Amino acid sequence: MKYFATVFLILSTAFLAHSQTYEIGGMIGGANYIGDVGKTNYINPNSFAVGGLFKWNRSARHAFRGSVLIAKIKGDDQKSSNSRRKERGYSFENTVKEVSVGIEYTFWDFDVHAQKAISTPYLYTGLTYFWYDAMYKRGNDVISDYDGASSVAIPMVLGYKANISTNAMLGFEIGARYTFTDDLDGSNPVKGLADSEGLKFGNTNSNDWYVFTGITVTFAFGRRPCYCNF
């Protein structure tokens, strides 16, 4: 085991030393959810979110990107403009922990080592896997968690980034995640309560969304890119 660890460390160091440009950094901002409880605004960050990201710049126009994110999400019928939701009065809080991989595409060429000020809009999509608390509505109309659960989502991100030095980038992005679950708010219980029709409420034919809005800061390392054909 020690031998393999040593070989892995040597190969990793050599790879990074002779690799094309990478970026590493973090993101911070707010999150909101869209579902069967509370407001239905698409962009309404009302809870804290923080994460990290890594990019492998394969050309001046695209990069492979991986990220992690932890976001609080919540909904409160009393803050909704929908009169029926206000009268119902449900509320909940949940925590989403995600891992995402995919491709980031810039509208214009973006050299992370440019000697002049540059900027570009960008798009990102891929596949997200996330963990959250499975929830249900108890008899007293209180929504509570009862187990851990996980699901997948499709991220759809629009952003704008600029260089702030020869190896540092600052960005702003809004990213919606379409999830393959309807239980972030407890409206459609999963796992052991999946067949409990009496616990369901809202539109059970529409899955939940959650949205991250915030800034990203990344730092480039590795040699200046030569950008191969791929």
Q: Which role fits each region the language model picked out?
A:
Residues 26, 30, 52-56, 101-105, ...:
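Residues on the lipid-exposed face of transmembrane beta-strands in outer-membrane beta-barrel proteins
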Residues 78, 165-230:
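Predominantly the C-terminal beta-signal and adjacent terminal strand-loop region
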Residues 36-41, 77-83, 114-117, 134-141, ...:
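Outer-membrane beta-barrel translocator domains and adjoining extracellular loop/strand segments
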Residues 20, 44-48, 95-99, 119, ...:
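Residues that define the transmembrane beta-barrel architecture of outer-membrane proteins
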Residues 18-57, 212-225, 230:
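Short glycine/proline- and aromatic-enriched beta-strand/turn motifs that initiate or cap beta-hairpins
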Residues 34-40, 84-92, 141-146, 200-203:
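Extracellular loop and loop/strand-boundary signature of outer-membrane beta-barrel proteins
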Residues 60-138, 221:
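Gram-negative (and chloroplast) outer-membrane scaffold detector with strong preference
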Residues 22, 61-64, 111, 167-170, ...:
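Repeated loop/turn-to-beta-strand initiation elements of outer-membrane beta-barrel proteins
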